[in-house]
């Protein structure tokens, strides 16, 4: 007794925890579940504690009732749902093969499933009847690993028989990815017409051009030899031709097709597509399902800009962040403008580059404007602005594009011009109350917002809002910091003001502070600051994340190729794939690009020296600063 009292004295614990300790702790073993499985498997291997016998195809399989009930809905309903099997020592299982039942029980006891071509079908049948989603998923994955042109119809039948929508979608994806080759097989013509119609209507159909869709539609009804020899009748066109997006075909191909057709509905359709090509100026206003790109790849894209090395070079390169590779690639279209700091807008998946700087020899503002069409990789020069605008901002509101203020290197501007794609014309709308340049703008909830900038030599922190319905400007609360040559982005009901520079310290410095304006509360706040300086950056928003591309760092005294991505949910910045060159004045946007472009080998990628990557040094030479003098920032 004395020893017990001594032990109690020794082991006495405090009844009241101190403030620095929590009352309870919960511990979780990472090995418990595997140990439990090993224990259950040992019981099965030793034949211990079996309490039910499954009778399958006349053969007996002993098992543990509680484990079966815990493993799937079928056995849970049988053994815990008030059915007669609750009291039976032997339970008859119908519709399942003995081998498949052994496979499934092995999975229940071990979490392992061995599949082969000889057992996958009966295992899938059993898993569907016994309602075991994991095994169904494994069987579908195994089948997809063996799918080819010869057996795909059989797998489709299995998917239909057991209502396996996920497997059907995987089979559809297989055909969409291999359409050109598959459309030349006999199995293609054995698919139901409705299935082929659905596949040919998909934006995920992987073709290099729309002509391959046209040929694929014909190959469902005619042999390859008949199509190649033009031994087909199109007076009553096959229904599948409804899925062909004729305006996406090249005009020369359409003209040849039109010339050989007699009077027919198809000829009228082709004539409409030819008219689309001839009315190039009106194409953005003629968009519909027939002109939609067969792609779901939305990419961050950058146009133009100015490099620092080997000399000050205005870029005519367009670059995009390839979502498949996670790296930047170049694509070059003929007649691409060689500019920097252009205003940029996207309307109906056309890119508009508005005004900007052409500062190769001295300062020169631009009034010229261009439009890029990713459907045909083609540039088109649209109507010029009514006056030159450098260091402007450009926004889309509704069906119009607005070019706001800027400067012409003689005067600061307050003028605002509005572009109507339907008439290819610019008109003046209500000007700003005061001149501003090097500002930034974005659109939110049908209104246009601009922030900060410069007026003369002064840096601003002003905020203005334009209401197109009343054609009026309203002044909002000032932002928290002066800045210019920055960027703006809109997410949810918030405006983000990012990057730029000011001279609050008495000399030009980067602004790392990121300001956020709530259109609901009409108040400013600050979010996570930029990890590096970005003056004259490209800005784009994709998947609720803000991309900040390149620009100038006055703290470093150089242009940069950095890419930083802001995650609003986490309020943090991440490093993105770095640009191939140090560049400022990049005009950035988000654009749907053709699948064929993303799968092409890169061509025409400029071979710039490695010195460009190392250009972000803290100290610059006199010649470097002379190069900087040709930038938009002064």
Swiss-Prot record:
Biological process annotations from GO: cell division; cellular response to amino acid stimulus; cellular response to L-leucine; mitotic sister chromatid segregation; mitotic spindle assembly checkpoint signaling; negative regulation of autophagy; negative regulation of type I interferon production; positive regulation of cell growth
PROSITE patterns linked: BTB (PS50097)
Kelch repeats: 299-349, 350-399, 400-446, 448-493, 495-544, 545-593
Entry-annotated residues carrying Phosphotyrosine: 466
Membrane-spanning parts: none
Residue numbers carrying N-acetylalanine: 2
Listed Acidic residues bias regions: 624-634
GO cellular component: centrosome; Cul3-RING ubiquitin ligase complex; cytoplasm; cytosol; intercellular bridge; lysosome; mitotic spindle; nucleus
Record domain BTB: where: 50-117
Pathways involved: Protein modification; protein ubiquitination
Predominant localisation class: cytoplasm
Positions where Phosphothreonine occurs in the chain: 463, 475, 605
Region (Disordered): 600-634
Protein name: Kelch-like protein 22
Organism in which the protein naturally occurs: Mus musculus
Lineage: Eukaryota, Metazoa, Chordata, Craniata, Vertebrata
